[in-house]
Structure formats: structure tokens, C-alpha cells
């Protein structure tokens, strides 16, 4: 059985609102060198290790401009305008339970990729149960979004025992999502 997803205007509007915050940012996909650590041995067979990162915001997009765009979107949606930026562009999509938050932020990732070339996303959730639900949502929406955008997201659950996943996250130019529960940040050793 294949699930059918309807296009909901409020979900598209939420994704567009996030994309609009960064209007003026050019579409770029820069590369950078992956730091292989201090134990590297140089040989004539060593590869050049290239990784991918989201392009930094251009200097013309100042914090004041970003804040004013956020306020404009908030006013248009009858939301009390923010007094200041929270963190460095900490944007939140708030919706009622069961209306498609996960769908909306997956759509937002595709739209940010389409508009600006951004391809690295980290989803931090408060619990293992929610992490598993988010992972399942990525699985069941994969084909739907692939049909709409012509590409698939590579997603994975962070596990400190599988560091090759993080290496792939950094070295793959496609859209990549790491799903992690907040407890994993503080975990040590095998608990991470």
C-alpha cells in the first residue's frame, strides 16, 4: 500500500516563510577539505578528501535584515514579532500535533536546497521515541518528495559506533539529514 500525500497550502506557506528569511542569498554549493586528523600519512596514493558544507550567508544579509524579514513574516501571520534573534538564526516551525510538522520541515529542507543549494541538515529531537518517529516519517515520505523534487534525501540516525555515517554526511554533495536525540550530545562511549 502506497500512502498518498496531499499538498497542503499551510505546509507550503511555512516552508516558503523559512526560505524567504534568506532571500538574496545566492545558490552556491561550496566544497571544503575534510580534516583527517593528526595521524595522516602522506603517500602518493592519498586521495584529496572533499566534503560539502552549506554556504555561509553573504555579508550583505545582516542580522538586522534577517530579523526584519522574520518580523515581516510574523506580522503577516498574526504572530508577535521577535524582539531579537534567538541564537544564530534559530527558526522554529510551530504547528498543532498531527498536522504535519515533520512533513513541513522535510519540505523546507528541499526548498532550502532548491533556493540556496543547502544540503546539510541536523534534526535534533527530545527523545528516542520521537527520533524513531521522525526517522519513519523520512522513510514514508521519501518517494513522495523524490517525485516532487527529483532527488532523495539521505537520512540516518546518529550512532557514535557508526562514524562512517558522519563521514558520508560530510562528503556527499546530496541532501543529507542527521537525526539525533538531544541525550546523544551528552552521552559518552557506547551510550552515545
PLM-predicted stretches and their roles:
Residues 1-192:
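RecA-like P-loop NTPase motor core of helicase/translocase proteins
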Amino acid at each position: 500500500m502506497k500512502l498518498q500525500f496531499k499538498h497542503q497550502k499551510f505546509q507550503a506557506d511555512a516552508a516558503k516563510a523559512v526560505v524567504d528569511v534568506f532571500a538574496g542569498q545566492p545558490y552556491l554549493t561550496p566544497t571544503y577539505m575534510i580534516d583527517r586528523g593528526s595521524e595522516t600519512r602522506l603517500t602518493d596514493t592519498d586521495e584529496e578528501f572533499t566534503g560539502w558544507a552549506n554556504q555561509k550567508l553573504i555579508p550583505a544579509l545582516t542580522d538586522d535584515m534577517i530579523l526584519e524579514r522574520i518580523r515581516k513574516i510574523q506580522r503577516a501571520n498574526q504572530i508577535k514579532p521577535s524582539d531579537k534573534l534567538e541564537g544564530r538564526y534559530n527558526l522554529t516551525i510551530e504547528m498543532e500535533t498531527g498536522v504535519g510538522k515533520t512533513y513541513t520541515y522535510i519540505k523546507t529542507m528541499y526548498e532550502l536546497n532548491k533556493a540556496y543549494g543547502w544540503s546539510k541538515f541536523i534534526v535534533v529531537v527530545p527523545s528516542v521515541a520521537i527520533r524513531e518517529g521522525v526517522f519513519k516519517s523520512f522513510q514514508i515520505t521519501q518517494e513522495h518528495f523524490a517525485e516532487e523534487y527529483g532527488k532523495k534525501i539521505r537520512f540516518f540516525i546518529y550512532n557514535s559506533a557508526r562514524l562512517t555515517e558522519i563521514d558520508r554526511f560530510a562528503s556527499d554533495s546530496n541532501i543529507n539529514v542527521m537525526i539525533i536525540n538531544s541525550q546523544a550530545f551528552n552521552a559518552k562511549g557506547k551510550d552515545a
